[in-house]
């Protein structure tokens, strides 16, 4: 009588099946059409996945699967790529999702604008102290980029609402940070 060995498959095959089984972003719960696979806070691209030829049986895959998460492209960029620390982008995004009735597309527009502005202000070595003074769109007006100034002002006013909401309804420290170690 022979003992049957458990069936082993390459990790890349398990990941392909995993990728196709995911329907919603693990972070914002948006229905997925394009997917970003993340392992321990780092994006793993399709070329790297295709090279994962380690053989696993089903039990090993069950353990390994806990290390992987499927995100929409937007959340993948926000949570896994370096961000400027000028604004609390992750907290702002959560606020827009949880406290407003905005569509995912509108949230994305506000977040992208604020992220670009934060990167721009950091590159210009603008002091973070300006965030403490009154209305953000007025405080930062002299340093706003010349293109799309109104769009940046609108995003700053929405961010001001987020900051006011934080002061009115103080919550425990948010588990969402601007780094990639959220997993």
UniProtKB/Swiss-Prot annotation:
Coiled coil: none annotated. One of its GO terms (molecular function) is DNA binding. It comes from the Bacteria. Transmembrane segments: none annotated. Pfam families: Phage_int_SAM_1 (PF02899). InterPro entries: Flagellar_regulator_FliZ, Integrase_SAM-like_N. One of its GO terms (biological process) is DNA integration. May regulate sigma factor activity. This is Protein FliZ. It comes from Salmonella typhimurium (strain LT2 / SGSC1412 / ATCC 700720). The gene is fliZ.
């Amino acid at each position: 009588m022979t003992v049957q060995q458990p069936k082993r498959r390459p990790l890349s095959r398990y990941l392909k099946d995993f990728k196709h089984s995911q329907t919603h972003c693990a972070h914002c719960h948006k229905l997925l059409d394009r997917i970003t696979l993340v392992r321990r806070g780092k994006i793993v691209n399709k070329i790297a996945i295709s090279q994962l030829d380690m053989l696993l049986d089903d039990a090993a895959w069950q353990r390994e699967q806990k290390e992987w998460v499927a995100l929409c492209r937007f959340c993948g960029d926000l949570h896994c790529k370096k961000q400027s620390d000028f604004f609390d982008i992750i907290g702002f995004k959560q606020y827009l999702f949880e406290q407003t009735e905005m569509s995912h597309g509108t949230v994305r527009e506000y977040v992208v604008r604020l992220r670009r502005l934060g990167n721009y202000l950091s590159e210009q070595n603008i002091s973070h102290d300006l965030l403490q003074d009154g209305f953000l769109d007025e405080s930062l007006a002299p340093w706003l980029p010349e293109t799309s100034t109104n769009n940046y002002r609108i995003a700053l006013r929405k961010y001001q609402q987020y900051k006011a909401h934080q002061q009115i309804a103080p919550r425990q420290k948010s588990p969402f940070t601007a780094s990639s170690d959220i997993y």
